[in-house]
């Protein structure tokens, strides 16, 4: 998701995505000066300019796009940085060296029993030169770059899935089903390829019984989709939980001591969606069910809980997940400001100023 945002944003601003950084997790109330101060403290040796900021609805936070303006040491760019409101995340696409690219390209073609000359001949170019270089006709070179090299790059370089076999005791490097499925769903959103290619990459991650299940399904239905494969794996290897069990787990999940209410809501959401999938809660009632459980499960006795209770007691519809998080985070920000003011006042009374 983040990589898609980085690439689309760069495309819209005509910026090379390999010369850009995406920083997100920035609080909504953080202004440009605060963002710049945090960036400069975390990346003092990195030369950049800020191209823009936006509100990222899925993260309920701001994101910033930076363009790298000088020579870049990618090792000096942190993946995370401490900032206002917590940890800010950083994403970038470091360029691959020409030597590594050519090596992987030739290995890929060799596995398929092809050479660059074979590719050129199939594309209709007569008497191709032995190696791609400056003497290659511009028409041929451009065509190969656009129609062969770029698709090959997307096939050779992509984020791999973790391994899953479905065995009772996972082997080295293998995951149990639930963590594997969560990671797989995240990566599938990042891949900008056809469903056939997604299915091929999915098969790469499967071993043992899990691979056997998909091979059998594919032999019976060659057009089976990636989503159908994942659904089948979930039915075979996922946890068996009744609708009643899922509902009890949801209703008995409470806010932990020291946990922010917004974090509790996010932690509660997968449990709620599981209850909805099991049919214990109707989709039309999901917002009301979420609000009621947040009020019941919160151990916070301050203004936030009172505000939520008033929201639930009102005649209007219950807020959706995004609206609820915005409401809670606004109240959390107010409480943090009040606590900071109270601390400063106390320090003043004690003569620390």
UniProtKB/Swiss-Prot annotation:
The lineage of its organism: Eukaryota, Metazoa, Chordata, Craniata, Vertebrata. It comes from the Eukaryota. Pfam families: PNMA (PF14893), PNMA_N (PF20846). GO terms for biological process: inflammatory response to antigenic stimulus; positive regulation of apoptotic process. This is Paraneoplastic antigen Ma1. GO terms for cellular component: cytoplasm; nucleolus. Its main location: nucleus. Antibodies against PNMA1 are present in sera from patients suffering of paraneoplastic neurological disorders. InterPro entries: PNMA (IPR026523), PNMA_C (IPR048270), PNMA_N (IPR048271). Testis- and brain-specific. In some cancer patients, specifically expressed by paraneoplastic tumor cells. Keywords: Nucleus, Tumor antigen. It is found in: Nucleus, Nucleolus. Belongs to the PNMA family.
């Amino acid at each position: 998701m983040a990589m898609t945002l980085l690439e689309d944003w760069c495309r819209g601003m005509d910026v090379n995505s390999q010369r850009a950084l995406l920083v997100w997790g920035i609080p909504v109330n953080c202004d440009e000066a605060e963002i710049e101060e945090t960036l400069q403290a975390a990346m003092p040796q990195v030369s950049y300019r800020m191209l823009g900021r936006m509100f990222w609805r899925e993260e309920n936070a701001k994101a910033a796009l930076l363009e790298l303006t000088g020579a870049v040491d990618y090792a000096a760019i942190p993946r995370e940085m401490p900032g206002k409101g917590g940890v800010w995340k950083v994403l970038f696409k470091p360029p691959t060296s020409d030597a590594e690219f050519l090596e992987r390209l030739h290995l890929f073609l060799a596995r398929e029993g092809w050479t660059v000359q074979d590719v050129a001949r199939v594309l209709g170019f007569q008497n191709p030169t032995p190696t791609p270089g400056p003497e290659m006709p511009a028409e041929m070179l451009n065509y190969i770059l656009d129609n062969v090299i770029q698709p090959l790059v997307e096939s050779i370089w992509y984020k791999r899935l973790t391994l899953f076999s479905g065995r009772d005791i996972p082997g080295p490097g293998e995951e149990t089903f639930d963590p594997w499925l969560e990671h797989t769903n995240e990566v599938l959103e990042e891949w900008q390829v056809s469903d056939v290619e997604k299915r091929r990459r999915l098969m790469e991650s499967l071993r043992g019984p899990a691979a056997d299940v998909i091979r059998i399904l594919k032999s019976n239905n060659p057009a089976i989709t990636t989503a159908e494969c994942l659904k089948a794996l979930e039915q075979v290897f996922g946890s068996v939980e009744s609708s009643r069990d899922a509902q009890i787990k949801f209703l008995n999940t409470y806010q932990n001591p020291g946990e922010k209410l917004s974090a509790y809501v996010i932690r509660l959401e997968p449990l709620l969606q599981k209850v909805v999938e099991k049919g214990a809660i109707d989709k039309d009632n999901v917002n009301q069910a979420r609000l009621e459980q947040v009020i019941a499960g919160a151990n916070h006795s301050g203004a936030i809980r009172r505000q939520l209770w008033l929201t639930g007691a009102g005649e209007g519809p219950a807020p959706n997940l995004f609206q609820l998080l915005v409401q809670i985070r606004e109240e959390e920000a107010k409480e943090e400001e009040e606590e900071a003011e109270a601390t400063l006042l106390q320090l003043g009374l004690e003569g620390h100023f």
